[in-house]
Amino acid sequence: SDLLSGGMKRRVGLVQALLHEPDFLIVDEPTTGLDPEERIRIRNLLVDFAEERTVLFSTHVVEDLMATCNQLAVMKKGRFLYTGTMRELLNKARGHVWECCTEDESLARELERKYHISSKQYTEEGIRLRLLGENMPSESGCIACDVTLEDAYIYVTNR
């Protein structure tokens, strides 16, 4: 087994599990350590397998969820915070995600204290922040934006 890479070990384990054609399959981080093409192959394999069976996916890789799941559950410290469809989860965070761009470092720090930040970038225009919270920022230059699955996860787990 020392001859196999982490990705190869993952593939071998998945094939072993699929050989028995279980009615219920649990996969934990099945695409971690795989190159992008292999990730897609594994996702497609699991989607095909799930057509007639139940596959429980445990992962932190948002792309895996978006490509494979029609039902989601979000857990924190052993408690379910959300169960339902991806669309319903995205709707929970709708109206609670904004993007602000500022050249003012102190304003950026203040926004970071007041909101959950899902993204921070230094651009030619200034500091671009993606904020999540209950109320729209009063600072100028903040606009509502489309919700990503990552935004929805952060919103639900930090309420």
Question: What would you call each of these model-derived segments?
Answer:
Residues 42-130:
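ABC transporter nucleotide-binding domain
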Residues 19, 78, 138-140:
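Short, charged low-complexity intrinsically disordered segments located at boundaries
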Residues 1-76:
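ABC transporter nucleotide-binding domains
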Residues 33, 80, 140-143:
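Short N-terminal micro-motifs specific to bacterial/archaeal maturation
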Residues 115-159:
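C-terminal coupling/interaction segments
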